[in-house]
Amino acid sequence: MAKDENKDRIYELVKQRNEYMQQGKTLEEVKVLKELAELTEEVYGEESNENIQILNELGGTLKYTGEFETAVNTIIKAKNIIEKKYGRDIVPYATCNLNLAEVYRFMKKFDKIEELYLETMEIYQKNNLQNDYLYASVCNNLGLFYQDTGRFQDALTLHEKSLEILEKLPEYKLQYATTLSNMVLPYLKTGEKEKSEEVLDKSLRLIENTVGKEHSLYSASLNNMAVQYYNEGEFKKALKYFEASAKICRRSFGENSGNYKSLLQNIEIVKERLGKNE
């Protein structure tokens, strides 16, 4: 009887989690995922496919709230179960790699990240997923890694590949908008200011029309707009958009989030520049 009750609770939590995802409420989503992980292991077993999936999803989401150690341990646990049961050439193993690489990217532990991304791409290719959303995701995320390490032209090549795939998958319009937003900085850095403005404007409109102005993805686009204004020397406008982005980011991810801390640093930098210009 208790097992049936737990299954009912799992169903309720999955529904609740999906609502929080749609609303961009990551702090609330993490709480739900943690309870889901406990119940899923209890109901289906530690080595079940259900448990593998929830561990992977929990680990991938924890990076946004700054719970890096737990994120790494959770994903590695899922990877080990998959490897033991199925080997390394299946899609869930690749997705674990992708999530682990993203956690390391948020932690700025860059030494093994590229290897993880490339292994992920290879596994997706072996499984004929070159035109799938999953392949678009790894292209986009590897592009972000190249941005973090100053390889902006390489980043653009990968973001463009991601867009090419997502254009044919209309159900992923939010992910399409996110990829556009991710292209703002590399276009700026490679001297293509008009393209940078074009993708920023398009991404903002798509995100606003899809999930509204309170979503974490809208926060990311506001951050990109602030970066544009900062690079143009319009520090008051940059401050306005950094602060608006930080407000949404804090609600979505909490004060321990790396994104939120980065925004606070940017706000201080802009205030310092404004002080010098007065």
Predicted regions: what is each one?
Residues 1-12:
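TPR-adjacent "capping" and linker segments in tetratricopeptide-repeat scaffold/adaptor proteins
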Residues 2-4, 42-46, 84-88, 126-130, ...:
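Short coil/turn linkers that connect adjacent helices within long alpha-helical scaffolds
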Residues 11-22, 49-64, 91-106, 133-148, ...:
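Conserved alpha-helical positions within TPR/SEL1-like repeat arrays
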Residues 37-42, 79-84, 119-126, 163-168, ...:
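Amphipathic alpha-helical segments of tetratricopeptide repeats
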Residues 235-254, 268-271:
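TPR/TPR-like (Sel1-like) alpha-helical repeat modules
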